[in-house]
């Protein structure tokens, strides 16, 4: 699928692996793609910034969400450095990222586009019904439909 990515979309995917590693994740997930998109000069990144989601804020929101999820299942994370708990040299692609990229491919095909661009990736992430990205957006008060309309 990566052969269908445009240049900027490839950069987003590559940067997402760095974001995942920087957050101590053993896998690249949809939320890491979202952070990477927010850091681009592409209109998809601008849409995220206009919605109030800058890359650092997203990283912080991911960390808070992770801690909330652990707390819900009874794991106390106070005093634990979670950023280094799951390090690998290179994170593998996780299910939510793969699903988001599959939806991005469907978006590109549905629009008759030959290549997958950043806008397709963002649309693919916004189409998720469950998972970290919808939780993050809801927690930050972001209307997914409104954000989708900006693309």
Where are these regions (language model features)?
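Histone-fold recognition with a strong bias for associated Lys/Arg-rich disordered tails
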Residues: 1-151
């Amino acid at each position: 699928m990566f052969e269908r990515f445009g240049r900027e979309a490839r950069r987003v995917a590559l940067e997402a692996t760095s974001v995942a590693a920087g957050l101590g994740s053993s896998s690249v997930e949809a939320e890491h793609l979202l952070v990477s998109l927010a850091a681009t000069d592409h209109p998809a990144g601008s849409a995220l910034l206009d919605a109030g989601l800058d890359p650092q804020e997203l990283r912080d929101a991911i960390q808070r969400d992770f801690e909330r999820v652990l707390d819900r299942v009874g794991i106390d994370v106070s005093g634990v450095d979670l950023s280094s708990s799951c390090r690998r040299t290179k994170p593998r692609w996780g299910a939510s990222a793969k699903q988001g990229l599959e939806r991005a491919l469907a978006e590109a095909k549905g629009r008759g586009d030959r290549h997958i661009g950043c806008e397709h990736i963002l649309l693919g992430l916004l189409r998720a019904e469950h998972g970290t990205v919808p939780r993050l957006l809801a927690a930050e008060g972001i209307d997914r439909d409104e954000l989708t309309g900006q693309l």
